[in-house]
Swiss-Prot record:
Keyword field contains Metal-binding: yes
Gene that this polypeptide is encoded by: prpB1
Organism: Corynebacterium glutamicum (strain ATCC 13032 / DSM 20300 / JCM 1318 / BCRC 11384 / CCUG 27702 / LMG 3730 / NBRC 12168 / NCIMB 10025 / NRRL B-2784 / 534)
The protein's assembly and partners: Homotetramer; dimer of dimers.
Keyword annotations: Lyase, Magnesium, Metal-binding
Protein's recorded name: Probable 2-methylisocitrate lyase 1
Cofactor requirement: Mg(2+)
PROSITE patterns hit by this protein: ISOCITRATE_LYASE (PS00161)
Enzyme class of the recorded protein, top EC level: lyase
Further remarks about this protein from its record: The prpD1B1C1 operon seems not to be involved in propionate degradation.
EC number(s) per entry: 4.1.3.30
Length: 305
């Protein structure tokens, strides 16, 4: 086992991720706000890992209004991709600028070892897709954004997903027409942001019958939460849970801190904590110990052919 990189090379991870998107069963991608969460997602048996721009911003105590940089996003994506054999899909916002910036974004994220990214049709700087007051660029501007990203791609298995926020701005029919244009520009998958109801998802799938579609099941937003089974029955190929793990973690942290402040001890939380032994197991402490022991006892000519 290589302790400091993946057990599966990036080319095979991308192939497997693309195959999962085309499989009969929906690919479920929980969001990871850290490499350790990504490893937990893999051990839980999911089909992929999602890295949310909103979560990267929140982890830096910033709002999701386009304040993070390509450097910050690529750095976190690389950290996460390093520790999991699953394909990682990254939120690349608007591509961090003009079409040439979108092209550079794809190059940087390919170098980071992820399986794909999505680009959106909001103006730059953007805002959270479930907030009011969003603005979208003209369709031809987003088409150039997608075309630039596709032209910069070196690995044909790197997935380029086009996200449209137009449903909440121009209406669902306009979003459908945009999706068709983005597919014509070379997008591999369409992310339909902030649809409201199951009926909306069915309507969108009926209008775009053959393309890969991704659904966003984020909490406390504009979208009714649908199960993976329902989305699969509708015909969606992937579903993300972008902020779920962060919200669970932060909810628990805030409750625990309040109790510690009130009672002066964390003892009441011990049965709700991850045990030290489980953390060590997740971190693969024993593998590091074996590696260290081998190096410590290394002798020239012994087991080093």
């Amino acid at each position: 086992m290589n302790l400091f990189s993946n057990g599966v090379d990036v080319g095979r991870r991308r192939q497997a991720f693309k195959a999962a998107l085309a499989a009969p069963h929906i690919a479920r991608l929980p969001g990871a706000f850290s490499p350790l969460i990504a490893r937990s997602i893999e051990e839980a048996g999911f089909e992929g890992v999602y890295v949310s721009g909103a979560v990267i911003a929140a982890d830096l105590a910033l709002p999701d209004i386009g304040l993070t940089t390509l450097t910050e996003v690529a750095h976190r994506a690389r950290q996460i991709a390093r520790v999991t054999d699953l394909g990682v899909l990254v939120d690349a916002d608007t591509g961090f600028g003009e079409p040439m910036s979108a092209a550079r974004t794809v190059a940087e994220l390919e170098d980071a070892g992820v399986a794909g990214c999505h680009l959106e049709d909001q103006v730059n700087p953007k805002r959270c897709g479930h907030l009011d007051g969003k603005e979208v660029v003209r369709t031809d501007v987003m088409v150039r954004r997608i075309a630039a990203a596709v032209s910069a791609r070196r690995d044909p298995n790197f997935v380029i997903c086009a996200r449209t926020d137009a449903a909440g701005v121009e209406g669902i029919d306009a979003a459908i027409e945009r999706a068709k244009a983005y597919l014509d520009a070379g997008a591999d998958m369409i992310f339909t942001e902030a649809l409201h109801s199951e009926a909306d998802f069915r309507y969108f799938r009926h209008a775009i019958p053959d393309a890969l579609l991704l659904a966003n099941m984020t909490e406390f937003g504009k979208t009714t939460l649908l199960s993976a089974d329902v989305l699969e029955e509708i015909g969606y190929n992937a579903v993300i849970y972008p902020v779920t793990t962060l919200r669970i973690a932060m909810g628990q942290v805030e409750q625990a801190l309040a109790e510690i402040k009130e009672h002066g001890t964390q003892e009441g939380w011990l049965d709700r904590m991850q045990h030290r032994s489980r953390l060590y197991e997740l971190l693969r402490y024993e593998d590091y110990n074996v590696f260290d022991q081998h190096i410590f006892t290394y002798r020239k000519g012994e087991n080093n052919e």
